[in-house]
Amino acid sequence: MFRRLLIATVVGILAAFAVAGFRHAMLLLEWLFLNNDSGSLVNAATNLSPWRRLLTPALGGLAAGLLLMGWQKFTQQRPHAPTDYMEALQTDGQFDYAASLVKSLASLLVVTSGSAIGREGAMILLAALAASCFAQCFTPRQEWKLWIACGAAAGMAAAYRAPLAGSLFIAEVLFGTMMLASLGPVIISAVVALLVSNLINHSDALLYSVQLSVTVLARDYALIISTGVLAGLCGPLLLTLMNACHRGFVSLKLAPPWQLALGGLIVGLLSLFTPAVWGNGYSTVQSFLTAPPLLMIIAGIFLCKLFAVLASSGSGAPGGVFTPTLFIGLAIGMLYGRSLGLWFPDGEEITLLLGLTGMATLLAATTHAPIMSTLMICEMTGEYQLLPGLLIACVIASVISRTLHRDSIYRQHTAKHS
């Protein structure tokens, strides 16, 4: 057991450096090509001329597509093993390392060029790859899946600063691929990754800064639960839209570079209306949490961002949809809160409260992982007083969503690529 905990510590350290490496590569490319050193793609888009804002996501998608197609032609074959950590956990615990690194590089290109796709997916993949490489060198074959799981959880902890949620992500989303008794090493890896990541970044700040001064009353619990019901209905709709957009792009029968370029061009067109559509949504989430906008502004940005996410994910842009889902949930919750706020004197606090609830419940509705979703929002924002209400709402959202749409976003993703 001590040996496993020691290896889990090493995996956590490797994962933290993998995530930091991807993050610094992003910052370097943004500085080189976008003349942006703020770390915010929304700021980068705001400072670009309209024609560059239009074309940059398309060019990034084109470059990523050419890279993926070029690699496939160079090797004369499709990847001989999984290039996704979920698939690796559900098979024999092995990766096609070269193809996985090329996929991560393609993700780096689309993410830094403004596509509305999550960067954290590539970060978690790189963390799992580092763990897998170490495991194949120093551990027996029957443990490889465990260390990939530890790497994925550690990558999630480093990316989102949420070690408990990262550990439960493995237990809930990938349930059945590992014994719950193995959660000890997973948690150790996640916590170590967070601590090392904090040292690298010289900061232990929360991912999102929120000033929520409300005391949760019986009325607030009712509003939180009703938001869970709303998210439970919206989650399956979002999954259906993503699936439909993917089928729509596939039906065009374009070569991968042109398909990704088309997705990027749609993002570029939408960014002419608002630069907030660029990137994974982190900057926009933080700005909404700092100062919730008016109803019509939320609605406008929400629609543009939703179409951008659908275009990016539908075109096959390599990356995650975890953070974009957080923004969509925040916007749905805030739209609901703004509508209800017309009838309450503390409308601003209700809007913020239901925005946070929307983040957790839509995440639960799309992942079918209510405990992970609850802890994720609490760890990212530090608002632990919301935990009881969020847990109830997330369970309700997950049950409704699972009833209406059998597959979670991750099972849908795995089925699509199998």
Swiss-Prot record:
Gene name per UniProt: clcB
Domain of life of the organism encoding this protein: Bacteria
GO molecular function terms listed in the Swiss-Prot or TrEMBL record: voltage-gated chloride channel activity
Protein's name according to its UniProt entry: Voltage-gated ClC-type chloride channel ClcB
Organism: Escherichia coli O7:K1 (strain IAI39 / ExPEC)
PANTHER family (alphabetical): CHLORIDE CHANNEL PROTEIN CLC-E
Pfam families: Voltage_CLC (PF00654)
Keyword Lipoprotein part of the UniProt annotation: no
Function, in words: Probably acts as an electrical shunt for an outwardly-directed proton pump that is linked to amino acid decarboxylation, as part of the extreme acid resistance (XAR) response.
Location of this chain's protein in the cell: Cell inner membrane
GO cellular component assignments: chloride channel complex; plasma membrane
One GO process term, biological-process aspect: response to acidic pH
Topology within the bilayer: Multi-pass membrane protein
NCBIfam families referenced in this protein's UniProt entry, alphabetically: PRK01610.1
SUPFAM superfamilies membership: Clc chloride channel
Coiled coil: none
Annotated TM spans: 5-25, 54-74, 98-118, 120-140, 146-166, 178-200, 222-242, 258-278, 291-311, 316-336, 352-372, 380-400
Keywords: Cell inner membrane, Cell membrane, Chloride, Chloride channel, Ion channel, Ion transport, Membrane, Transmembrane, Transmembrane helix, Transport, Voltage-gated channel
Similarity comment: Belongs to the chloride channel (TC 2.A.49) family. ClcB subfamily.
